[in-house]
Amino acid sequence: LSLVSYGGDPRIVATHSEIERGRGTLQVAQNRMRAEFELTDFLIDPVQRALLALHAPSILLRIEKLQWACSAAAESYLSVEARVTNRIHWITQFIAQHPMLMALIPLGLGSRIPLALMGAVAATQFTDGKVSRILARETMGAYAGFTGGRASSGDDARAGAQEMINRAGIFGVLGSKAPALAGVGATPMRAAPNSMAQLTSRLAQTHSLEKPTVVIERYSDGKRKLFMVYLPGMRSKNPFDIAEPFNVSASVHALADAEHSACLLAAKSALETAGVGKGDALVIAGYSQGGLVAAELAAEGRNNVVGVVTAGAPVGHVAIPEHIPVMSIEHANDVVPAFAGKLNPLAENWVTVGREVEVKAGQTALVSHEIAEYQKTAGLIDESSSVGVSRIRDQLLAKFEGLRLVETQTFEYAGGR
């Protein structure tokens, strides 16, 4: 088992587009310098041209080396998956610009079953999860362009999800309504999490509870407070399951219109009931759909979010403030994170880390999305010496230093359509 990561390292500040822009600028400089050695130029200012010609070979050599370095960096940027995605994106752009190709789909099918949903279902059946990720990301990003006859940016997951709602033919099902608080409870006292494995284990416990539950821990040293929130993933794949606020309908709404999704409303209700003030420090961990909710809560800016941990969540499209340390744990062959429609950003305080999960004979790629596999990955994260991984990990765990657990509350919810 080996980890692959990017982001979280302040020494790495260039994005792929910036690398390409730098390479283009070097090419312009190289062409400009070579153009300075026409015979007529020497007649105008022979001394200066001679001096330039003397130093030109070494300068051009340095430019060529820098171009080569940019090419190598761009070629190895992130992963092969990202490069393949770019190629598939070109294809989807072409189809979006030529909507008549949609006529190839059987009559009536396009208006009843959204392509994004078809792609999602198909992707989960692939044994090669990395192919599934590419399909999912590109389908969600381009779906709005397909159906609207406009070119898609490839990043428009929100529009893609909204089109799923608009065109699914089950409008009453893919609605949203605030879930009802069904009960408030407490769990036995426990110490603050001292590792990513321990934090992810508590997230797994939250997800495995019998009823849809948000768990909130309150820490204090007598002067300052910190709240730790655990958000479960999608618990029901049935959009008609109105008793479940963390179902597939809420997942689609969380992508398209997060503010009114049942799962986000449940999280906000729990925070309010727990007495979390706007100035109280808040660390949020979420699995799958819960990770998306965690990212959206951080992006809203209504609470003092000081840390975010997501596992198997589609969050690349969410604009989380740059000062918040974020750890996104994503398996290379897990299709779910790809439904963000874009890769997570390369940022100083956002690290994306994961591994490729072994898919055995008879299994689908969905095994890589299981919370148990993310628990194993969290254990590897604790052992990692990668600058980006260790830096963000230590920042997150440092939030609990000097604090003791005061109480743990559980908030059960029902409904939410």
Task: Give residue spans per PLM region.
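Intrinsically disordered, low-complexity segments enriched in Ser/Pro/Gly/Ala and basic residues
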Residues: L1, Y287, E383-S385
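Alpha/beta hydrolase fold serine-hydrolase catalytic domain that processes acyl esters and thioesters
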Residues: Q48, H55, L101-D280, R302-R417
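Generic marker of "main functional regions" within proteins
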Residues: A29, E36, A73, R87, ...
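N-terminal secretion-targeting helices of virulence/extracellular proteins
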Residues: L1-Q97, R417
